[in-house]
Amino acid sequence: ANELISFIASMSGEGNLRVEENLGEGYVRLRVSEAERRQAKHDIQHVEDIVIEMLRNARDAGADKVYLATTKEDGVRTLVFLDNGSGVPQDMQERIFDARVTSKLESMKMDRWGVHGRGMALFSIKQNTDEARVVTSGVDLGSAFKVSVAADRLSERADQSSWPQAVKDEDGRYVCARGPH
């Protein structure tokens, strides 16, 4: 597979190739600019950003059921995610937290939170937390992930557990003015 990548690079020019390394089982390491690599550290600003990125990953893995359990003990927030998505092969369970590793070579998505599928979300989570790992997973069996972070390392949004409050905007439509959006 790496020979194929080398051949394509020699024919099309190194700059046109999106794949740096084929990791097998549908996973690749993408090329990325230094600016994107440095931005990864700033992609995760709050605990809620972790939840959003993990939900996006579950969605992209085909999960239609995702469960989240959370605790906070001695200043450490622990999140456990369970999903019924496509799963992570055993030999990729540590590598998916490396920069630019993705199974989404042809399916990068743009949604309200930005671009997803560059292989940077799990890397960003790992860079900004004390622990991020696959607890268990199997191909077509779903996955369980655990993420732990000290409250003084990554904050939680102040309104994360407040009740939503709807108010009318200038056009008379109800919008969420307070609480989770």
Regions found by a protein language model. Name each.
Residues 41-73, 125-126:
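Conserved ATP-binding N-box helix of the HATPase_c
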Residues 90-146:
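Flexible ATP-lid and adjacent glycine-rich G1/G2 motifs of the Bergerat
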Residues 155-181:
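N-terminal assembly/transducer modules of large multi-domain enzymes
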